[in-house]
């Protein structure tokens, strides 16, 4: 049985940062988001239980509140280097069900390449959450969201090795840490 959860996420992927929040909607999502799934399905998945996941870093930027059709503002720590491990900081704890490996989620998120003021992707800017199966996205999203609760608001930094790498096969995919 597949679980269906809604995740509102401003997310840092591989070389970008963001926030993620989850809320349950009780509906199943039949389709995965094209961008997150495209790279994740072509490579061997990382075993999340063997991955070192940090819960905070002094290098993480400050992220403001998103608004209607606008990504949140981001303020980078001057001269800070990107964390080398997947880093998942809980900004606000939720009280819903835990996100499982077979969950479908709907996420509101913004993604930035590390140290960039410009988003490479943002569901806030599109005006609607992105729906995807947790097993169909990059390892950084999958391992970063796994076990978090519906209602959580997260800031996630994803190193390139858990995303699209330093030289993505898809020229539209972001390279490095986000």
Question: Which residues fall in each region the model found?
Answer:
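Cross-family detector of peptidyl-prolyl cis-trans isomerase
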Residues: 2-178
